[in-house]
Amino acid sequence: MMQMSDKFNYEELGLKVGLEIHRQLDTKKLFSPVPTKFSDEVDFTFQRRLRPTMSELGEVDPAALEEFKKGRVFIYEGNYQLTDLVYMDEEPPRGPDKEALEVALQIAYLLNAKPVDEVYYMRKIVIDGSNVSGFQRTAIIATDGKVETPWGTVGIPTICLEEDAARIIERKEKEVIYRLDRLGVPLVEISTTPDIHHPEQAKVVAKFIGDALRATRKVKRGLGTIRQDLNVSIKGGARIEIKGVQELDMIPLIIEREVERQLNLLKIRDELQRRGVRPEDIKEEFYDVTDVFTNTKSKIIARAIKKGGKVLAIKLPKFRGLIGREIQPGRRLGTEFADRARKYVPGIFHIDELPNYGITQEEVNEVIKRLGLGEEDAFVLVAAEEERAKNALREVIKRAKEAIIGVPEETRRALPDGNTEYMRPLPGKARMYPETDIPPIRIPDELKRKIKENLPELPQVKVEKYVREYKLDRSLAQTLVDDERDELFEELVQMGVKPSLAASILVVVLKGLRKEVPIENISDEHIKEAFSLYLEGKIAKEAFEEIFKEIARNPNKTARQIAEEKGLTLLSEDEVRKIIDEVIEQNIEVVKNKGMGAMGLIMGRVMAKVRGKADGKLVSQIVKKRLQEIVGGGV
């Protein structure tokens, strides 16, 4: 289904997209009875080095091997309340957590999937330090789910229940610090088939899955609790895994940018092949051109030489004019080279961007002469300690050879602007082997039946209900559900609050405060207490905004305390009448001249005195009545 606004004809390009959505569950840890809370309190630390192991087939995963080559030491910070021996890898796992398993089954049914009869846990090799054990435990909970979209059906082949990784605190050159509070938080992983053929379709599928997850009321909320990964490919291109897409609305743009990147890489490939270059033409030959830059004005190069480093160059035959070619807005083939080299050096220089960065045309000409470059040939420079410079240039050579072949398969990181950058090679299948510490878990038919018969409402069903039963505006109802305020809304309505008022305060008032104060400090209990005061006649609805502002700044205070301290408790009707009479007396000449036309002026001045302390409707009624009495009942 092509749309008029499409940048590309995705059908012609053979676009295929698959989603992987991970969401934290709000239960205990998956294999220990430890709370899943986060804390900055550190009671102890320990360190580990991790090494790759072979799979059942005797193979080593390429992504794990690349991580190992970095030679990093991992420091782990723990808290006695939030970490136990299981997640220090000093004790066998327990569980899995019964509640987490039941929530995963709920999600499976909401996504039209079929739960398995027995759950078998596997170990997935992960040696970037985020798992102390060097592996992540994961199991398939259900298969054969589906999502219906206007473009067609998208399959959900697997729904898994696995452990989340440790929280990264600091990354240094040879050391990474992790905190263990997040390690072991249950994570549901939902994978779709690559049957998504349009960027907007991917967004629709992701939203439906997100709605099903939220419907359980057992998923965590907030930044980092959901991670969306995309697998994107086009005809002639390659499968690219894009990690860490945080925002739903960014999904179409990220897919569009990846399509653009692959198309441009294919154009570069075609041009390189037209020029007659082959991968074997790129030699691992390093040219020491340090003396060319003895008096350079480039601060980066001068600093490297001063530290005892060297300036090394490589020759890339037939690449001139292509390294600087844009492949995504603001990113070039040279950026791809730099991404690969970054594990060894902060950056690289290439011929298409020079002279620049303090490097003169004379220095460029001398490097061209030293390397014996032809008109179509290019060079790449690195200034660093010799071995680091060589390793960085080896990465550039590898990526340049891939450019001649086409689009390399790899895992990339989503960037805030919709572009992506290189992370690591695409993981192979050689990273899984059986978990020997956890026996198979049989799922009783009775449990399946009970869960299936008591499924929660999907968000869209709730929106329709709120519009129909509570007469809410559709956009207000949708926002209420999207912001996950619907459960609190229903509690407030059960307390006796008018649905329109409850929805307005939760959506309009609280959202309006977001730019002024940290509204995440306002808990559901704070909100319910404020509404209790309103129902008791202690505060006016105009007081909510001021009370919530103060709670956001001082979350340890109660709504009642703030109402009393700020003088927001409701005035009696007699007190309101007295203030109205005072205001009318102060403006009696205006009242005599304008009659009922003075209503707006009097209301404004009264409300300036009683806002938050009196109901606006009551004030309006009394003002109108008093003015009618004064002007002889005129309207």
From Swiss-Prot:
Residues 415-437 are annotated as: Disordered. One of its GO terms (molecular function) is glutaminyl-tRNA synthase (glutamine-hydrolyzing) activity. It is an enzyme of class 6 (ligase). PROSITE patterns: GATB. Coiled coil: none annotated. Pfam families: GAD, GatB_N, GatB_Yqey. GO terms for biological process: glutaminyl-tRNAGln biosynthesis via transamidation; translation. One of its GO terms (cellular component) is cytoplasm. It catalyses: L-glutamyl-tRNA(Gln) + L-glutamine + ATP + H2O = L-glutaminyl-tRNA(Gln) + L-glutamate + ADP + phosphate + H(+). Keywords: ATP-binding, Ligase, Nucleotide-binding, Protein biosynthesis. Its EC number is 6.3.5.-. Allows the formation of correctly charged Gln-tRNA(Gln) through the transamidation of misacylated Glu-tRNA(Gln) in organisms which lack glutaminyl-tRNA synthetase. The reaction takes place in the presence of glutamine and ATP through an activated gamma-phospho-Glu-tRNA(Gln). The GatDE system is specific for glutamate and does not act on aspartate. Belongs to the GatB/GatE family. GatE subfamily. Heterodimer of GatD and GatE. This is Glutamyl-tRNA(Gln) amidotransferase subunit E. The lineage of its organism: Archaea, Methanobacteriati, Methanobacteriota, Thermococci, Thermococcales.
